[in-house]
Curated annotation (Swiss-Prot):
Disulfide bonds: none annotated. GO terms for biological process: DNA damage response; leading strand elongation; mismatch repair; positive regulation of protein catabolic process; regulation of DNA replication; translesion synthesis. This is Proliferating cell nuclear antigen. The gene is pcna. This protein is an auxiliary protein of DNA polymerase delta and is involved in the control of eukaryotic DNA replication by increasing the polymerase's processibility during elongation of the leading strand. Promotes 3'-5' nuclease activity of the DNA-endonuclease apex2.L in response to DNA damage. NCBIfam families: pcna. CDD domains: PCNA (cd00577). Residues 61-80 bind DNA. Pfam families: PCNA_C, PCNA_N. There is a cross-link at K164 (Glycyl lysine isopeptide (Lys-Gly) (interchain with G-Cter in ubiquitin)). Homotrimer. Forms a complex with activator 1 heteropentamer in the presence of ATP. Component of the replisome complex. Interacts with apex2.L (via PIP box and GRF-type Zinc finger domain); the interaction is required for 3'-5' single-strand break (SSB) end resection, assembly of a checkpoint protein complex to SSB sites, and SSB signaling. One of its GO terms (molecular function) is DNA binding. SUPFAM superfamilies: DNA clamp (SSF55979).
Amino acid sequence: MFEARLVQGSILKKVLEALKDLIDEACWDITSSGISLQSMDSSHVSLVQLTLRSDGFDTYRCDRNQSIGVKMSSMSKILKCAASDDIITLRAEDNADTVTMVFESPNQEKVSDYEMKLMDLDVEQLGIPEQEYSCVIKMPSGEFARICRDLSQIGDAVVISCAKDGVKFSASGELGTGNVKLSQTSNVDKEEEAVTIEMNEPVQLTFALRYLNFFTKATPLSPTVILSMSADIPLVVEYKIADMEHVKYYLAPKIEDEEAS
């Protein structure tokens, strides 16, 4: 038997919004330590890794480890039926072919329950190696979303250049070019408004904006985003989820030959 109750049910709604446009179906791995998910997007270009720790839920019970195959669009449709202040409970019997979602209003006067059919998925887990990165940029998540959205008007790809003093986002296309430079902030009252850069060596890499715009759908989950970059390995875009862990997106840089084609 598995049961997890989340008083701040809106977190789960935001998690699904952050994932559903990128991945259509995924295995949710449920263990005593929490819920995790790892999946390539449908075009096998990017990778998503989600961790929700058990101690971040208000109550959590998992009698035995299980993996449940979920169609993300179906789960998203059901979670849309929950109000943003509802308490959400997920429940599944061992080896069940459905999962139950219960939505309770804060005053307990309205309780809805939905049963969703599970899928039989056979997904191979990819090992994600621990990496040291040349540049780690921490910045407001809303700012990153806006830069990606704005530069999408100019071109299909963004060049991210990281140096000690700041980070530059550049795009070019038929109508011209666009550049956004963010300097490292020295003194900010609110930590989430700061731009901080930890740099071992400068990095300049090119990424497809289409995917970055999918990643920024996680913006409501966290006030800050962390970008980790090194030459020739995937960019990591990480959103911390309060008290629960994170969602991380991995995207390989575009290679010069691709840009020319």
